[in-house]
């Protein structure tokens, strides 16, 4: 079998540069090592009489790994449905299946079609065998395409008719696959980790959690290892779901790369993966068996809403108000703050940079301006040079002499009713958000470098009293507040609060 799988992988490398519509179709072929690992995740006791779906089959890399797994388990028959939109790949799919003809009886259908259309129509057509539950799949293995779905597209409308709301082809493929499975059916797929959190994938997460149980999730330590031949830099996760079964503990594994030579594995109660009261249904993937400082302390249990603090995305989208932007402050302008203006506890303003420093105050922009005051800002996008995912800064009213200020769209702003918050709370939030424990905790459930307002709303914070104490300490030691000092002071305050509880 090894020789056959090597042949399929050589074919993958040969065909990859020949793809004419790779970007348009969001095609990324699966390397042999990943295909084999994914095929090994299926339960041994469920492999007989397999009815297999490979959606976005490519040249058949995943199907070949699945067939090799069946053969290794001495199973002599498989029923395959391979869906592929690119008709150029049909002969390669046929060649892949032909490699196995002497080893296993294959009943296969290669369907050259748009999977979303094929699946949605199959589910919506009352006369369809799939819609009538007469023919469902027992196994699905997929590496779906990566491409955004336009809001007014045919795909979006079809998905909505099928009861699915999602924004990317990969989540659409997985959601439809879930609906095409029989109860007890197993689905193994590899997609970007970004589906685990954020508002855009909330409906998708709900769809999965309502209809399946999560059995296993696997991560790679390096974000560029899964599809290195395609130079994909997104962090990917391999997941195994089971349709219609009771949720139990979840296995989390991690490997350094796609050789899978060294794998660490842990088991977690499901409530550690998806917190029971989380309406966003964020999926937390902890890759160590150690509890973070945030998890250790039960007094870190407050949401921003419970602390009477709001968070909003900076409302000024600069390209929409180009005519109002000014390189430097001048008559009739007010400050416009970008992420680059905030460095530690300091505001560097005005600043020589490519971005403007000011915006004309007029009727058009007035609705986006905030009264001057104490605000905490969190950069939405962290740069490669920054060690932390969450990078927070503080605006103080004495930093500028203007009655109102603007925050650009690259910032999240913590405020109260679109006004400033108390000085002590602002500095306390600044220190807490910039702490190492918060960074570690955030990385557990955030698969990308973007920090959204929703991420901050779902985070847990210490009590207002602890934030005030932390803030007072920052104010008193403003010149000597480094990473080590912040981490040490936060732990001290949390331990003292726990001891007094």
From Swiss-Prot:
**Gene from which the chain derives:** hsdBM
A Gene Ontology annotation in the biological process aspect, one of them, is: DNA restriction-modification system
Gene Ontology MF terms in the entry: DNA binding; site-specific DNA-methyltransferase (adenine-specific) activity
- This entry's Enzyme Commission designation comes to 2.1.1.72
- Determine if Acetylation is one of this entry's keywords: no
Protein's UniProt name: Type II methyltransferase M.BsuBI
Family of the protein in this entry:
Belongs to the N(4)/N(6)-methyltransferase family.
Domain of life of the source: Bacteria
Q: What is the lineage of its organism?
A: Bacteria, Bacillati, Bacillota, Bacilli, Bacillales
């Amino acid at each position: 079998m090894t020789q056959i799988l090597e042949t399929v992988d050589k074919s993958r490398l040969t065909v990859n540069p020949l793809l004419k519509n790779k970007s348009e179709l969001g095609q990324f072929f699966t390397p042999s090592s990943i295909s084999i690992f994914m095929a090994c995740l299926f339960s041994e006791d469920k492999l007989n009489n397999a009815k297999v779906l490979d959606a976005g089959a490519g040249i058949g890399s995943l199907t070949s790994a699945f067939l090799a797994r069946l053969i290794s388990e001495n199973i002599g028959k498989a029923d395959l449905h391979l869906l592929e939109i690119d008709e150029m790949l049909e002969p390669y799919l046929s060649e892949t299946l032909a490699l196995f003809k002497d080893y296993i009886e294959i009943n296969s259908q290669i369907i050259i079609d748009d999977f979303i259309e094929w699946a949605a129509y199959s589910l919506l057509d009352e006369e369809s065998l799939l819609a009538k539950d007469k023919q469902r799949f027992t196994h699905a293995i997929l590496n779906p395409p990566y491409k955004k779905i336009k809001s007014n597209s045919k795909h979006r409308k079809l998905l909505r008719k099928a009861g699915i709301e999602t924004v990317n082809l990969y989540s659409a493929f997985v959601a439809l696959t879930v609906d095409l499975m029989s109860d007890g059916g197993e689905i193994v797929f590899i997609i970007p980790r970004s589906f685990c959190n954020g508002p855009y994938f909330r409906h998708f997460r709900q769809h999965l959690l309502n209809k399946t149980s999560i059995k296993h999730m696997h991560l790679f330590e390096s974000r560029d290892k899964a599809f290195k031949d395609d130079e994909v830099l997104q962090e990917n996760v391999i997941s195994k779901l089971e349709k219609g079964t009771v949720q139990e503990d979840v296995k989390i594994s991690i490997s350094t790369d796609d050789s899978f030579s060294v794998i660490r594995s842990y088991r977690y109660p499901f409530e550690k993966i998806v917190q029971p009261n989380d309406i966003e249904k964020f999926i937390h993937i902890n890759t160590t068996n150690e509890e973070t400082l945030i998890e250790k302390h039960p007094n870190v249990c407050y949401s921003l809403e419970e602390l009477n603090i709001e968070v909003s995305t900076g409302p000024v989208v600069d390209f929409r108000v180009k005519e109002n932007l000014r390189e430097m402050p001048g008559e009739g302008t007010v400050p416009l703050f970008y992420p680059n203006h905030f460095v530690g506890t300091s505001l560097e303003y005005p600043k020589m940079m490519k971005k403007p420093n000011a915006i004309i105050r007029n009727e058009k922009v007035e609705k986006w301006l905030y009264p001057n005051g104490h605000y905490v800002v969190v950069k939405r996008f962290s740069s490669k040079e920054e060690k932390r995912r969450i990078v927070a800064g503080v605006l103080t009213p004495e930093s500028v002499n203007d009655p109102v200020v603007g925050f650009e769209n690259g910032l999240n702003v913590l405020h109260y009713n679109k006004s400033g918050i108390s000085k002590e709370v602002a500095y306390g939030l600044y220190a807490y958000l910039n702490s190492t424990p918060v960074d570690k905790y955030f990385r557990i459930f955030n698969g990308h470098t973007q920090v959204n307002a929703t991420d901050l709303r779902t985070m847990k914070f210490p009590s207002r009293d602890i934030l005030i104490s932390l803030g007072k300490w920052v104010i008193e030691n403003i010149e000597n507040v480094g990473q080590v000092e912040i981490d040490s002071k936060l732990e001290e305050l949390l331990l003292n609060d726990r001891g007094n509880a």
